[in-house]
């Protein structure tokens, strides 16, 4: 109802920390897709829409950095698509996350094997240096569950200054991007039967 817009929704915060050795960086290309049509070296005018009324998808590349001697070298690989998100006013990375609400089964140790009650999908996400591992304790955790802070990273802050740009986005070493529960699509619907 209009008075209870979150009724029946399990709202969630999602964090994406960079606990690696180098920046996580994406760079957009000038390759766009509208339905089954691919447009190369395309520079769409402001407000451009596909024939079906949707926004075009823009191919992105992920840059991976390596230190060779005293210089950085990088390689690029295809990494999915960006799409314009009208309620936020900028481009996001498509298909960032899938959230599932599951029924606990005490006879099954692997939680991914528990029955799915419902799911939600985050159709887009922006990569940005929103906070630090020290500023968001508990969001940066290593593979054995140790909580990491800024001092845990010898390359802390490497790169830096990423924002939600239309060409380059990223997360610096020791930084965290957080997608708040108050934003679009940050929920899983709880079925009436549950």
Outline where the language-model segments fall.
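Exoplasmic/lumenal beta-rich domain surfaces
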Residues: 96-97, 107-193
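Boundary/junction segments of secreted and surface-exposed precursor proteins
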Residues: 1-33
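Solvent-exposed loop and beta-edge segments used for protein-protein assembly and interaction
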Residues: 4-8, 91-93, 184-190
């Amino acid at each position: 109802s209009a008075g209870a817009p979150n009724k029946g929704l399990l709202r969630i915060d999602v964090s994406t920390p960079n606990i690696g050795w180098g920046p996580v960086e994406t760079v957009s290309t000038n390759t766009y897709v509208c339905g089954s049509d691919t447009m190369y070296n395309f520079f769409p005018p402001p407000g451009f829409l596909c024939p079906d009324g949707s926004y075009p998808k823009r191919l992105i590349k992920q840059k991976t950095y390596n230190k060779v001697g005293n210089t950085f070298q990088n390689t690029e690989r295809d990494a999915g698509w960006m799409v314009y998100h009208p309620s936020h006013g900028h481009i996001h990375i498509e298909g960032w996350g899938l959230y599932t609400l599951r029924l606990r089964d005490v006879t099954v140790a692997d939680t991914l094997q528990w029955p799915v009650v419902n799911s939600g999908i985050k159709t887009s996400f922006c990569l940005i240096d929103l906070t630090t591992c020290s500023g968001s304790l508990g969001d940066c955790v290593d593979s054995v569950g140790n909580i990491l802070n800024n001092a845990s990273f010898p390359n802390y802050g490497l790169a830096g200054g990423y924002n939600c740009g239309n060409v380059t986005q990223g997360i610096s070493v020791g930084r965290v991007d957080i997608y708040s529960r108050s934003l679009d699509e940050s929920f899983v619907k709880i079925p009436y039967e549950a």
